[in-house]
Amino acid sequence: MKYKNGLKVFAMAALTASLCMPIHATDKEAEFDLYASVYDYGARVNKVVCELPEEVLMDSIQKDTFRVVSDNKSTINLEVDNGERTIEDIYVSDSKDGERQNFGNYIIIELETNLNTQYSDVLQWDDPSFSNAPLQVEYKVEQVKPMRTTEEKETLYTWKQDEFKQELVDDFTEGESHGIHYRDYKPEEDGNKHPLIIWLHGAGEGGLNNVTHINGNKGAVAFVSEEAKEVFDAPYVLAPQSSDYWMPELELGDLVLKGTDVTKDLVACIRDYMDQNQGIDPTRVYIGGCSMGGYQTWEALFEAPDLFAAAFPICAAYEVPADKMEALKDIPLWIIHSENDSTIPVQYSRDAYENFKKAGGQATYIEYPNVQVEGQDYESHAVWVYPLNNETKDEEGTTFFQWLASQKKEEQTTNWMPLIVVTLVVAGAIFFMKRKK
């Protein structure tokens, strides 16, 4: 009997304790931001940052406290493959980009992101049109376990997405000139002249959205990394987008891509951009691109050889005419291709290099046997990952960034001597005529 009474007392005490435990209601709302970065294989969502109105303890949070699920929407009326993301790490901080702390009002959720990670894309591939389109990036975050605050209260929230932010990409502004849409990065004005780097995207990143070409690979953002800013002395970066394809036509097996020749408009766009940004050093204008962007690099050089200090066509989709090389012989080139490229024959770049040398040009040619990053095989055409990560070096050990940053045209100065001679001759003739009278 005493035993039963003891159980009753214990049960009542436990019930009273549980009722007194301060548990916050689940209808409390808080917001999270999504973050994405551009990798060798394109832009991927890699982080969630949750902001709380109260501080929570780090030791009350584990990976299984949250579920993160992509809920992206197509902008081209295609079905989207969504699903749960793998949480790689989770920690508490005192700011959105802060370090791990014992307590704070920000929860940083780092998501697994690699070449084969599912549901992480910010672009959607459309095979029939051979092009990417931007996704409407949306995620759902669910808190499945309560957390403890610094006041030792358990708290549970309903989470709502706020902003979608992209590292480096958000540092670019957008514009349009001569019918060419572009993204661009401008360094802070400091009264000095800075180089201009022009990046031309490949097939599949064209359109009128002004976003896929900057998210498809590191093409533009590579040149605004901290390393690039230091090597290039804070460059301007211009990333134009073709409305469809740079090339009028390209055959890829049974697939025929038909585009529009906008070379004259592109060059006009570049000149206009330089006129609008007086901080650009006209003796340090560099142009390059990959695949179809490599083709457009060559065409821009032929259209305006006086404009560029150096160029870097990468795995260019172009059998470059040998008889046109003479006009480019004074422009240093860095040409890159992979030997096993199954999209564009490596012979295109080999021939371009040899013909350029025969015309008297100076070029660095780098050929990789394949494309492999950290032991993982990439698509054989994607040789641009090496120069964009500044991992390409010439025989002397000079990196691609170092080589490009060292190129400079001779400043164009006006030769006044012929005018002075003519002026003196005319003045002398007038003086002689007056004396004769």
Tell where the protein language model's regions lie, with residue ranges:
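The conserved beta1-alpha1 loop
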Residues: 200-202, 337-338
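C-terminal membrane-anchoring or membrane-association module
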Residues: 427-437
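Primarily recognizes the serine-hydrolase "nucleophile elbow" in alpha/beta-hydrolase
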Residues: 274-327
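A domain-start/cap signature at the N-terminus of enzymes
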Residues: 26-51, 62, 70-194, 410-411, ...
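Gly/Ser-rich "nucleophile elbow"/oxyanion-hole loop immediately N-terminal to the catalytic nucleophile
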Residues: 192, 249-291
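C-terminal catalytic histidine-bearing segment of alpha/beta-hydrolase fold enzymes
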Residues: 314, 334-336, 340-343, 347-413
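Sec-dependent signal peptide cleavage junction
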Residues: 20-28, 414, 435
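Active-site machinery of serine-nucleophile hydrolases
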Residues: 196, 203-264
